[in-house]
Structure formats: C-alpha cells, structure tokens
C-alpha cells in the first residue's frame, strides 16, 4: 500500500496547516543566502515529499463527515485516516503496522490501546470478536463492532480507538447512510460498525508511545520527549532537566 497523496480536510481559519506543507520561496532564499544548506534541504523536502490536496469541511459535523468530504480526492482505493492530535512515537511507525494488518486481512483496521474503564466516554470503544483468534502476538485483534463514547457500564471492552485508521473505500457508502449520532455528529465509528457486517474489521495495538497533543499537558510532554531524543538538542535538554529537578 503506497500513499501518493495527503488529503488535508480543513476548515475556516486553518490556512497555517496548508502553508506548512507548501513551498516557501522567501524562507528558501533566506537560507540559501546564509549558506544554511542543511535546513534548506529540510524545507524543500516538506513541499516535495508528496502530492498535497486540500478539502474544506464547511460544516463541523464530526469526524465521519470530514472523512466523507475527502471522497472525491481518495477515489476507489483504501486509505489512511490520521488525526493530528494523536502523536505515536516508536521504532516502527504506527501507521505501517496498520497497513500490514490491512494487507493481511484485506479489511479495515483501527488503532487501539487499553484505557481505564471510566475513560470510555472519551473514546470510541471496540467490541472484540470472541470467535476469532488474535494474531501477531495478540496485537491484531478481530472485532465484532465499535461503540462511540459509551458509558463505562456499557463499554464492550477496555480498548479505545486512537486516531489512526486504514479503511477500504466501502466506508464512504456507509458514511452517506449514517445518521447523526453522539454529539449530533456523523460518527466514523458508526459507519465502521455498519461496515463490519460486510468485511473484516480488526484492531491493532501499536507498539510505541502515544501522546495526546490536543491537551496542554500532552502537548508539553510530547515536546519534551521529542527534544530529549533530538540529536542536536537532546543532550542539553537532559542537562537542563536534571538541573531543574535537583533545584526542586
């Protein structure tokens, strides 16, 4: 499964996301004049790495609606959905793990992780199929269904969906017929639930570390984590953190 394009589904006031991936002639000229070839290559690589398509979601009707807006850009191929407020870091890319599971099962795949039962109201929660065995050391799990943000007493498992999916194009038909659900939104989980009656759906436990960068604490934690692993600033960050901890 080879990705040739990135489809950004955005809304009003989010041009900065589009601009980030666009060419930056002024910045490139500045870096070239300074002789900063290393950073010049990085800036140019961002705009050259993939074909970028932007789609506007004019109404905020949920994740399922956002995915449906990308239908014409995606076409009739399987595709990945990546939510930017979930950052997963590991030796092996989390999305690559999902793609492997998709190619093995020829179905749709959702990324999952264990969550406290009381947190079920914040996640889509999966229902495990007890009649089919898990594979790959228990990391790839056949599913019977999904429920969006159930009450703890109603949650079918303690596995919550993280913001990574690989879906077949059949999902678009289901999204078109999906009624507004939780929060009066078109829920992607409801459409995947309908899809489960026709093709395999599996959950995939990721092997890395996950950060919720949609929260202030998660955003700060993710930045510190990535800074500590950075080849240029990691050493200085560790020294500074050690010094701060000793002060306290």
Q: What residue spans do the PLM features occupy?
A:
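Short, small-residue-biased leader/transition segments that mark boundaries at the very start
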Residues: 1-2
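Short internal beta-strands
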Residues: 7-10, 112
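Residues in the short beta-alpha loop(s) of Rossmann-like NAD(P)-binding domains
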Residues: 11-14, 21
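Phosphate- and divalent-cation-binding pockets in alpha/beta enzyme and binding domains
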Residues: 16-17, 191
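Glycine-rich loop at the start of a catalytic domain that most often binds anionic cofactors/ligands
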Residues: 19-25
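Conserved beta-loop-beta/alpha segment of the NTase-like Rossmann-fold superfamily
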Residues: 27-32, 37, 43-130, 167-169, ...
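Catalytic-core segments of class I nucleotidyltransferases/pyrophosphorylases
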Residues: 80, 95-103, 131-238
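Intrinsic disorder at enzyme termini
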Residues: 237-248
């Amino acid at each position: 499964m080879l990705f040739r394009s990135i489809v950004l589904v955005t809304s009003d006031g989010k041009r900065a996301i589009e601009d980030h991936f666009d060419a930056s002639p002024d910045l490139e000229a500045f870096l070239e004049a300074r002789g900063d070839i290393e950073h010049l290559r990085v800036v140019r690589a961002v705009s050259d790495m993939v074909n970028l398509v932007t789609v506007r979601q004019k109404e905020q009707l949920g994740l399922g609606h956002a995915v449906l807006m990308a239908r014409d850009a995606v076409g009739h191929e399987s595709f990945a959905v990546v939510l930017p407020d979930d950052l997963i870091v590991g030796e092996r890319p989390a999305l690559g793990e999902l793609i492997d599971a998709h190619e093995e099962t020829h179905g749709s795949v959702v990324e999952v992780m264990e969550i406290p039962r009381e947190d079920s109201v914040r996640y889509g929660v999966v229902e495990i199929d007890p009649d089919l065995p898990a594979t790959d050391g228990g990391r790839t799990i056949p599913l019977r269904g999904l429920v969006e943000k159930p009450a703890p007493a109603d949650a079918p498992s303690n596995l919550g969906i993280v913001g990574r999916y690989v879906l077949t194009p059949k999902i678009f038909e289901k999204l078109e017929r999906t009624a507004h659900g939780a929060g009066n939104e078109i829920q992607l989980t409801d459409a995947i639930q309908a899809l489960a009656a026709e093709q395999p759906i599996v959950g995939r436990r990721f092997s890395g570390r996950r950060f919720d960068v949609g929260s202030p604490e998660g955003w700060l934690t993710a930045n510190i984590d990535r800074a500590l692993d950075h080849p240029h600033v990691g050493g200085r960050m560790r020294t500074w953190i050690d010094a701060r901890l000793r002060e306290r």
